Regions:
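Short, conserved micro-motifs composed of acidic
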Residues: 1-28
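Basic, alpha-helical interaction scaffolds
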Residues: 23-91
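Charged/polar positions on well-ordered alpha helices
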Residues: 6, 56, 90, 109-112
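Short, charged alpha-helical motifs in flexible N/C-terminal segments and linkers
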Residues: 1, 101-128
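Short intrinsically disordered coil segments
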Residues: 14-19, 47-52, 127-128
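Structured alpha-helical bundle/scaffold domains in large eukaryotic membrane-trafficking regulators
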Residues: 73, 93-96, 119-126
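Charged boundary/loop elements
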Residues: 86-100, 104, 111
Length: 128
């Protein structure tokens, strides 16, 4: 994978070791320290993966901790869900409205899981 103005580089990359030449395969995306970089430096696949991971953790929390108080839920949400979504966000900071809405939906669904504030509007649930 190459970064630059012209990503249509035709040269092959290789690694030489003990007089042996190993060709390196070209990739469309790479996972580095948990952040998925693609050849266009768009983080759509990374955001999709993190949002899906957050939903699966929310499902796990919902199945195992049905009648949880507000403070306990906030603690579990921040440690298990939000940490996944916000990891390295200074690198992949979402700038497209579509990506921001995907991430916001995770929090919206999480606030609906708390029985004591479930019936409030989303804005009021965030103020709690």
């Amino acid at each position: 994978m190459s970064y630059g103005r012209d990503c249509r580089i035709n040269s092959d990359y290789y690694l030489c070791c003990n007089d042996t030449r190993y060709n390196l395969e070209k990739l469309d995306s790479i996972n580095d320290l948990g952040v998925i970089f693609d050849k266009n430096l768009k983080f759509d696949s990374h955001i999709d993966k993190k949002v899906n991971k957050a939903y699966s953790i929310l499902g796990l929390i919902n199945r195992n901790f049905r009648n949880m108080n507000f403070k306990s839920f906030v603690l579990i949400y921040k440690s298990m869900v939000r940490s996944h979504v916000e990891y390295a966000n200074s690198v992949w900071s979402p700038y497209k409205i579509m990506d921001i809405e995907k991430i916001e939906k995770v929090q919206k669904r999480a606030t609906k899981m708390i029985n004591s504030i479930k019936n409030l509007t989303y804005e009021n649930r965030l103020r709690m």
